[in-house]
């Protein structure tokens, strides 16, 4: 990740950087791709676009009476030309914008918290530094990213600004006008990733326990390996979940995952995580070479290229034998476990005689 603003001249010194952007606007970095995308026929593309446009024109009917059709079409992949509008509707951002006319521009007129503003200024250049929108401070990407993050910090002062939000906002700005991106961002932060960015990160810790429980169900050998070497979920999944995979997956895979994520919610991120973990450590030969915590983390943090390919992730995500009830059961179990831990900590603190209450561990 970059630590200072870079121009194209600066980053061109790196051997992984091209003088021409790829079809998605990347000059370099792991999300650049020079592989040709398998083309659909023009007739197929037009047919899909028409289906989506009709569905969006009748959105409330589909959401109330035929949501399964929306979900299935998202899993198949949203046509590129329709994706911005589809995400705007899938996330519910179109309703937020309708209920809050002119709010985004009004937020931009406000000064904001000085400390938060400085944090945003320091962080904005670090997002997708190899993408044409974010190459330097004068590019529209960095300007709009600052505006969206500043506006949100004022809109939801309870959360303010968290560094993990920045790649999500930048990712959305690559697809949507700034005001629309802001409202999708609000929906993602306040609904899809609700309470993820509150200081203490208690929700992400709870979800780490849920992920561990689901891994035990879906891939017992891998679960046992992680337990044996004391590989805690927070050591490898925090960035995946907090950034909603935006800093983890190749570009085409990320787009497909977000098509599903905005239709089905956080369960999609759980499933993608389970696919990566399971596929990375499913072979006995690989587990045998992972003789400790560090070796195992290295495998999980740098999955093989084929594991994060678009079709592999999507197909294996759909094959996971997980019901909504499985997530609910694990959520209830983790909630009870954390309540018990909290009670024990309070009891220990009370018994120590100094009245000190231990805080939940933070990241």
From Swiss-Prot:
Phenotypic effect of disruption: RNAi-mediated knockdown in the trachea results in a U-turn phenotype in which the seamless tubes undergo a series of 180 degree turns in terminal tip cells.
A GO biological-process term: lumen formation, open tracheal system
Membrane topology recorded in Swiss-Prot or TrEMBL: Peripheral membrane protein
One Gene Ontology term of the molecular function aspect: GTPase activator activity
UniProt-annotated location(s): Apical cell membrane; Cytoplasmic vesicle; Cell projection, Filopodium
Superkingdom field: Eukaryota
Region (Disordered): 335-363
GO CC list: cytoplasm; cytoplasmic side of apical plasma membrane; cytoplasmic vesicle; cytosol; filopodium
Record carries keyword Membrane: yes
The Rab-GAP TBC domain, residue ranges: 77-265
Keyword hit for Electron transport: no
Functional summary from the UniProt entry: Essential for ensuring the polarized growth of tracheal seamless tubes. During seamless tube morphogenesis, likely to act as a GTPase-activating protein (GAP) for Rab35 to regulate vesicle trafficking from the recycling endosomes to the lumenal apical membrane to ensure the polarized dynein motor complex-dependent growth of seamless tubes along the proximodistal axis in tracheal terminal cells.
Name assigned to this protein: TBC1 domain family member whacked
Organism whose genome encodes this protein: Drosophila melanogaster (Fruit fly)
Lineage of the species this protein comes from: Eukaryota, Metazoa, Ecdysozoa, Arthropoda, Hexapoda
């Amino acid at each position: 990740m970059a630590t200072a603003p870079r121009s194209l001249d600066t980053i061109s010194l790196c051997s992984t950087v091209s003088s021409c952007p790829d079809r998605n606007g990347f000059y370099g970095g792991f999300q650049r791709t020079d592989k040709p995308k398998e083309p659909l026929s023009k007739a197929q593309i037009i047919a899909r676009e028409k289906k989506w446009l009709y569905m969006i024109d009748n959105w409330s009917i589909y959401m109330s009476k035929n949501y399964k059709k929306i979900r299935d079409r998202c899993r198949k992949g949203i046509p590129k030309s329709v994706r911005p509008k589809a995400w705007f509707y899938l996330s519910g951002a179109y309703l937020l914008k309708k209920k809050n006319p002119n709010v985004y521009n009004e937020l931009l007129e406000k000064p904001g918290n000085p400390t938060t503003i400085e944090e945003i200024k320091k962080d904005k250049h670090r997002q997708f530094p190899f993408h044409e929108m974010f190459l330097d401070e004068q590019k529209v990407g960095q300007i709009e990213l600052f505006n969206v993050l500043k506006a949100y910090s004022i809109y939801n002062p309870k959360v303010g600004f968290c560094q993990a939000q920045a790649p999500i906002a930048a990712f959305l700005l690559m697809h949507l006008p700034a005001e629309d991106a802001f409202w999708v961002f609000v929906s993602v932060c306040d609904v899809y990733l609700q309470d993820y960015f509150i200081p203490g990160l208690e929700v992400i810790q709870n979800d780490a326990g849920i992920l561990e429980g689901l891994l035990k169900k879906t891939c017992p050998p891998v679960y046992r390996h992680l337990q044996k070497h004391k590989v805690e979920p927070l050591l490898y999944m925090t960035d995946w979940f907090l950034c909603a995979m935006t800093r983890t997956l190749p570009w085409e895979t990320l787009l497909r995952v977000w098509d599903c994520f905005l239709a089905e919610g956080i369960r999609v991120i759980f499933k993608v995580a389970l696919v990566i973990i399971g596929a990375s450590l499913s072979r006995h030969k690989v587990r045998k070479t992972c003789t400790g915590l560090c070796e195992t983390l290295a495998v999980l943090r740098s999955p093989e290229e084929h594991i994060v390919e678009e079709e592999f992730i999507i197909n294996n995500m759909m094959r996971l034998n997980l019901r909504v009830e499985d997530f609910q059961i694990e959520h209830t179990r983790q909630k009870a476990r954390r309540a018990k831990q909290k009670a024990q900590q309070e009891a220990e603190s009370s018994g120590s005689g100094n009245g000190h209450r231990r805080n939940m561990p933070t990241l």
